[in-house]
Amino acid sequence: MPATDLNTMPDHQPNTQQILAAGPKPRIAFATMVGDEPFFLPIWISYYARFVPKDQLFILVDGAHRILPPEADGCQILTLPHVIPGPGWDHARWAMISAFTTMLLGRFDVVVFNDVDEIIVADPDCGTGLIDLIARARDVGVISPFAIEVLHRTDLEPAALHNRAPILSQRRYGRINASYCKPCITARPVRYSLGGHYSDYPDLHLDPHLYLFHLRFADYTMLLARQSNRQGLMAAGGKGGDAVAGAGWSKGAAEMNDFLQSFVKAGPPIDTDFSFGWQRAKITKSWVHDPDGGIWRHDKLHNRKTYTIPPRFADIF
């Protein structure tokens, strides 16, 4: 099936009513699933609430014991029974998420599902807003944004991340990680792979103007704390390792430290126009059906090169 590039931001705090009033409104739902996320969930809510009313933000909550931030008031909250992780746990979770997004498509034109530390942004230079770019999924079925993994380059930005200023004004560096060019903008029912990295949808539409910023590695201390929590979840389910969730869930503090330091050792950040033409072409050309998983996927593309995130993105979220 074809793999193609789609061809044809607001400032940090735009007027939500102006965004919602600009032309015909496609019905778009944004959804995520969380445990305890006191830092990233308020960012996720505050960002997407600038584009759609809060009742179009859906939050699946893993367990009634979770504490939600005040920003969640007005969002669609679905509290689920907590399930102790065991073999097959994350596969079952993503099967549930696939079914949930399909259900939402019964009432919405497009559903955008991401982990809470993944933010989709329209390139401010493209001249088209986030909602209009996302709405193109109605024509093509499924859209994947280009993925940038935001890095904490402790040698260049030693200060801890905080919520008193936009994230990308504090973290100006990232790397390419094609695994996060996820088929996360859907106007058709899909069955997601583990982690939502791929799906059974046969066409790849890698949008030239949409970026997914993955924030997992944006702060060293926060990374270690979240990773420790994930390891605790894995341990609660007993033995199982990668059979419980993705391999990244079981990595320890030393591995996380070595990962971030590997970018420091690899050299200074590279300044580019942020179009990443050959990388996009490689992702597109590698599109293939995986019969074992019953999914369509592209090659992984990542290395230890650090890229400077252009200043035009600094105040978006």
What are these regions (language model features)?
Residues 1-42:
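N-proximal low-complexity "stem/linker" segments adjacent to membrane-targeting elements
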Residues 46-55:
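Short, acidic, metal-binding catalytic loop of nucleotide-sugar glycosyltransferases
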Residues 48, 112-119:
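Short acidic catalytic loops
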Residues 52, 104-108, 137-138:
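A structural signal for short coil/turn segments at secondary-structure junctions
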Residues 55, 109, 117, 141, ...:
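Conserved acidic residues
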Residues 58-61:
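Short internal beta-strands
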Residues 65-113, 122:
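Active-site-proximal specificity loops/subdomain of glycosyltransferases
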Residues 90-95, 122-317:
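Catalytic-site signature of metal-activated, phosphate-bearing donor transferases
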